[in-house]
Amino acid sequence: MITVNPDGKIMVRRCLVTLRPFRLFVLGIGFFTLCFLMTSLGGQFSARRLGDSPFTIRTEVPGSPESRGALRKMSDLLELMVKRMDMLARLENSSELHRTASVAHLAADRLTPGASLIERIQAIAQNVSDIAVKVDQILRHSLILHSKVSEGRRDQCEAPSDPKFPDCSGKVEWMRARWTSDPCYAFFGVDGTECSFLIYLSEVEWFCPPLPWRNQTAARTAPKSLPRVQAVFRSNLSHLLELMGSGKESLIFMKKRTRRFTAQWTKAAKYLAQKLGDIRRDQKQILVHIGFLTEESGDVFSPRVLKGGPLGEMVQWADILAALYVLGHSLRITVSLKELQSNLGVPPGRGNCPLTVPLPFDLIYTDYHGLQQMKQHMGLSFKKYRCRIRVIDTFGTEPAYNHEEYATLHGYRTNWGYWNLNPKQFMTMFPHTPDNSFMGFVSEELNETEKQLIKDGKASNMAVVYGKEASIWKLQGKEKFLAVLNKYMEIHGTVYYESQRPPEVPAFVKNHGLLPQPEFQQLLRKAKLFIGFGFPYEGPAPLEAIANGCIFLQSRFSPPHSSLNHEFFRGKPTSREVFSQHPYAENFIGKPHVWTVDYNNSDEFETAIKAIMNTQVDPYLPYEYTCAGMLERINAYIQHQDFCVGPSPLPPGASTAQSPFVLAPNATHLEWAQNISSVPGAWPPTHSLRAWLAAPGRACTDACLDHGLICEPSFFPFLNSQNSFLKLQVPCDSTEWEMHHLYPAFAQPGQECYLQKEPLLFSCAGASTKYQRLCPCRDFRKGQVALCQGCL
């Protein structure tokens, strides 16, 4: 039989008796809190506010004194409860000295729920504090609303019948049924009354006309724009490094890259400043939101930075940030959804309401992940401000995939399209899609002394394989061509591994493991050959190798890779066919720096290796991939691209008194007439336009390249008329306006001319043997394909 000290027994009984009413009281408080929350917020819980004391009621926001007083009393009572629990705990601890070990153990076990109870009380107190904040926000808006509503009469709050606002009555019906579906409506003052619906729909959104009895100064008006500040080139990048933040391996990599290129950015800024002279450049307010680095998107890149994962996106983003900053613009950089919401002015709720303030940014640079996040949280403001967005899009987005209605009707399926943006708002890593804007990145530019040192230090029989992940080395048939290469050259790899050599890498390959960027550069400076296995596509490494004096050898794809036959491209918003691992290197650089061969043909491969060993090349870097080239290009985009302006100059049915085109002397194409000035505000300038009728089955991209020119989609509206066909002496027995990404075009059977009905579908890409496409082309600057001769 166990004996129990009477004092200890009494102590335990007292604690248990004391705790029972506390439990009942806590249940009551919890039930009251839930009811209060549901009635005040339409059933929507507010997010927890981190960093505040769980017993702090924030009273700086004006609201209802009664509501705040009740919440304060609840919070004070909860605090008192916790203090009593603490006193009980101290009393119990002091009595332990007078108990036996067994009784102390029993009492401790019986009192354990007290600690859990304290935690529950603290959690309820935190929720009460959060509720107070939300209630204050709602009351702030609703009090203003009620004071204004009281000025009018009840019959003045009926949905008006105004033909200028055909959706008003339908929106009011929707608000009656769904206004509690998102707390953001209550945040803007909606309380379930007809007046609150109409005020919201006329002053926050724009579906209803302003109410005549409302004080119009109370409606939200855009603040007066401040005078523009002139952008000044920067040479010190230390503040940019602070703006970029830290904490992620991807950000650390980007900051290291920016530091390494600081001297080259500074030199490029001085060069461009002299080139532009006294041209005024307005400073833009720019938000850069790197969506793929947010936790909400998964941030799959950061964990792989140190394991040989792809770095192309981070290379490009680091260079974009540096270029924008060096050009003198004001930057905000976000890599989390919370930061994005704060900078945009997103109201609390589920993202159905517009922003609380006019968008404070002239431009927003983001990616597809960021684009999706903005659409989810900006409400109607996304449609209003999407013309300011620039989307960094590695592989490009063709117009047929961008136009939601057209893509859906014609089966252009994609995981990333349907945005209805101007296709030029998508910015690519390489200039493979003229429908988009070429953003690019930079590679290290060498001076003449460095180039000579590299040439003198080259090993004639050293090859480096392009591919840092072991999965790239799983290519079927690689043993065959690697055996041929091994006969002539020493093969080096930079494949990541933790402890054991990757089994995919043959024994005769000298694997250095994953190298830091400076050491990898040194390896390239010694090597003769940089060889690709067909993947990854269109990355920055081949350009870095060529810039360091290597010859790049890559595989020719037959048939070409595309979304129709290759898993990597499936779901991407493009039908582009890729004929090699790096089409830009093949088409814009070519031999002797770039060799493209059939790896399945051993004789062709071996012949190429022998020729490469006897070929001497200098380090080479296209101007458009230097710091100066990228600064020049981005500056031109910022100063001239404006996608918020009106529609195309020649809408359907329009005609001009005088055609701006003349037939070229050889009668092959159209040119802009010398006696007609360029269209004001048009960029590129219209005097650079050349129009050709492509052969059947030929895309405008290829038709322009055939003549040494670049397809320029912004010129399509000027050609989109029957006059253009007449000037080219093309007989049009009939002319039709339709929505099709291949128009304007001429169909030989029936002598039919087709004009484009939807400006967003003007497309350089796309071909059909049925049509001869009318193609707008332009010239371009040497080494800067994105800009025409007169584009600066």
UniProtKB/Swiss-Prot annotation:
It catalyses: N(4)-{beta-D-GlcNAc-(1->2)-[beta-D-GlcNAc-(1->4)]-alpha-D-Man-(1->3)-[beta-D-GlcNAc-(1->2)-alpha-D-Man-(1->6)]-beta-D-Man-(1->4)-beta-D-GlcNAc-(1->4)-beta-D-GlcNAc}-L-asparaginyl-[protein] + UDP-N-acetyl-alpha-D-glucosamine = N(4)-{beta-D-GlcNAc-(1->2)-[beta-D-GlcNAc-(1->4)]-alpha-D-Man-(1->3)-[beta-D-GlcNAc-(1->2)-[beta-D-GlcNAc-(1->6)]-alpha-D-Man-(1->6)]-beta-D-Man-(1->4)-beta-D-GlcNAc-(1->4)-beta-D-GlcNAc}-L-asparaginyl-[protein] + UDP + H(+); 3-O-[N-acetyl-beta-D-glucosaminyl-(1->2)-alpha-D-mannosyl]-L-seryl-[protein] + UDP-N-acetyl-alpha-D-glucosamine = O(3)-{N-acetyl-beta-D-glucosaminyl-(1->2)-[N-acetyl-beta-D-glucosaminyl-(1->6)]-alpha-D-mannosyl}-L-seryl-[protein] + UDP + H(+); 3-O-[N-acetyl-beta-D-glucosaminyl-(1->2)-alpha-D-mannosyl]-L-threonyl-[protein] + UDP-N-acetyl-alpha-D-glucosamine = O(3)-{N-acetyl-beta-D-glucosaminyl-(1->2)-[N-acetyl-beta-D-glucosaminyl-(1->6)]-alpha-D-mannosyl}-L-threonyl-[protein] + UDP + H(+). The keyword Transferase applies. Residues 46-792 are lumenal. One of its GO terms (cellular component) is Golgi membrane. GO terms for molecular function: alpha-1,6-mannosylglycoprotein 6-beta-N-acetylglucosaminyltransferase activity; manganese ion binding. One of its GO terms (biological process) is protein O-linked glycosylation via serine. It is an enzyme of class 2 (transferase). Residues 1-24 are cytoplasmic. Present in brain (at protein level). Predominantly expressed in hippocampus, superficial layers of the brain cortex, striatum, nucleus accumbens, a subset of nuclei in the thalamus, inferior colliculus, brain stem and cerebellum. It is found in: Golgi apparatus membrane. Its EC number is 2.4.1.-, 2.4.1.155. Disulfide bonds join C157-C195, C168-C208, C184-C353, C387-C644, C700-C775, C704-C777, C711-C764, C732-C753, C788-C791. Disruption phenotype: Brains from mutant mice display defective biosynthesis of O-mannosyl glycans. Mutant mice that lack both Mgat5 and Mgat5b display no visible changes in brain anatomy, but their brains display defective biosynthesis of both O-mannosyl glycans and N-linked glycans. The chain crosses the membrane at residues 25-45. It is a single-pass type II membrane protein. Keywords: Disulfide bond, Glycoprotein, Glycosyltransferase, Golgi apparatus, Manganese, Membrane, Metal-binding, Signal-anchor, Transferase, Transmembrane, Transmembrane helix. Pfam families: Glyco_transf_18. Glycosyltransferase that acts on alpha-linked mannose of N-glycans and O-mannosyl glycans. Catalyzes the transfer of N-acetylglucosamine (GlcNAc) to the beta 1-6 linkage of the mannose residue of GlcNAc-beta1,2-Man-alpha on both the alpha1,3- and alpha1,6-linked mannose arms in the core structure of N-glycan. Also acts on the GlcNAc-beta1,2-Man-alpha1-Ser/Thr moiety, forming a 2,6-branched structure in brain O-mannosyl glycan. Plays an active role in modulating integrin and laminin-dependent adhesion and migration of neuronal cells via its activity in the O-mannosyl glycan pathway. This is Alpha-1,6-mannosylglycoprotein 6-beta-N-acetylglucosaminyltransferase B. It comes from Mus musculus.
